[in-house]
Amino acid sequence: MMIPMKIRTPRARHVRHIAPLCLRPCVLAVLTLVSAQAAQAQSLAEPVLLALNARMPSLQDTVVTATRTEQPLADLVADVSIVDRETIESSGATGLADVLARLPGIEISRNGGVGNASSVFLRGAESRFTAVYIDGVRVDSQSTGGAQWEQIPLSQIDRIEVLRGPAAAVYGSDAIGGVIQLFTRRGEGPARPYVGVGIGSQGTRKIEAGVSGAAGQDGAFDYSLGIAREISDGFDAKVSGSHNPDRDGYQSTSGNARLGFRINARHRLDATLLASRMNAGYDNTSYSVSRPVDDRSLNRLRTAGLSWAAQWSDVYSTRVSVTDSVNRYETTPSPYLTETKLRGYLWQNDFRWGAHRFSAALERREDDLQNSPIDSSRSQDALALGYGLNTGRHTVQLNVRHDSDSEFGGKDTGSASYGYAFASHWRATASVGTAFRAPTLYHRFSEYGVATLQPESSRNAELGLRYAQDRSSFSVVAYRNRVSNLISFVGAGTCASAFGCYANTARAQYEGVTFAGSYHLAGVQLHGSIDLQNPRDLDTGKQLARRAKRHATLGADTRIADWTLGAEVQASGRRFDNAANTNVLGGYALFNLYASTRIARDYTLL
């Protein structure tokens, strides 16, 4: 049983709070106190709207991730999903990966409970093939490759944008499967403090607090501060080999600060900071009953960014940013420590001339890995150009980019997308693109590494059909993404290790069809997505590990009397736990129920 209580002064927009009642040993009820000022703006009879777990974005929403420039969703050809804070709260998720798993085209795998290593597969692609940003700050590990999802504190995230499909022509290395951007809260209006407290099964305790708002003349200075603490005794996670009969609990602490200053109508400064610490238990496969130990993983993440945005004229704007992130992973008592530092510099230029949009960017990325005995670094310098057109029924987006790596030289990528509105509310889309990922410093310079490894490269093509009107929408996207020079762990012989080495030996293909939709029928809002995919190794014909050929999410909510009720089911087919396809992981289904009612002017029961 988990009973959190939140005291919150919400934003002036329509307030939505939900928490799911999951069919597992954890039932969640929330009593939320909202400010009298916000309550006066809404009558008692007004329904509290549920933010669905996979909200279909409105065409009026603006998106940054597709082109690195803020654009209305209606102007984009890209396949994008948006998750807002209300949706995050409604999900009842304990981690970011659980929220993402509800979105079209995404499935996850996890090695144990909260705090243990997780993988996020975007359209079936390797977890390292997704570029991840927090407030524009790149998050990556030069040891394992890709973001360490368990390090990212969900309590500090206000909005998520997911771009499906290769985007290396915009973002450079890593964006073979897509891009996920995370945004922290941004202050506006009067000061709005909030406090949340929760207790639950498995000895779980949570507390969070923060404040956001704006001050100064016309709110020129805005701020948002937040902190959260979570502790759980966990459960006994079982692994192969000897079983350690302990509970693998976790402790996490996180905080964030976001400050903004509008110098005048044309210039603005922003600064962001996020930090998190996670201490989680796990079971080592080499556990011995005669010498029991409590194995722990210690995760630390810090991101910081400073940016200046300038609107020089009605048609020309620039943005300059400096970003920094530190990703640290350690295990005890088994001695292992790896730390990745990333530094980024970006000068973005945008021109708008009628229906035409032009962009030009210079970018530098510096990577550093400390993983004894490795002490290595590298840099990438890039020039990116983009062109967009939105006129009448036609939408065009073109991007090219050249990356110069200090280790392996230059790499060119490009993408072209076209959308045609052939009827009212309908649009057909087509796109092609290339992408790459540079091998990590660990892949090249560890005892298992090979210095001559080449970047993994991909070619993608996709077709889409979309419909959107009022509260109903539908989309279907068919894609095929082929990767060459795939880096895999093979037998010994080309490196110093006798256990095996990394090598460019494999080819992979990620192909499939994603259906997604939302429909309002007789007072019931339906939503869902179905993915049919075939992620496979082209050399062996085997299905790629830990990815199912079918997975889906279906849900509905409605209002009955004074209650808003909802239900959701997530289902996934069988997968394999190894590349040889000999260890089968069975399919599963997860059911969620949630409900909401206002019991007094200032109280909502969830």
Could you tell me what each predicted segment is?
Residues A97, A101-V137, D158:
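Extracytoplasmic beta-strand/coil segments of soluble accessory domains associated
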Residues A168-A169, Q181, E188-P190, G196-G198, ...:
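Periplasmic-side early beta-strands and strand-to-turn transitions of outer-membrane beta-barrels
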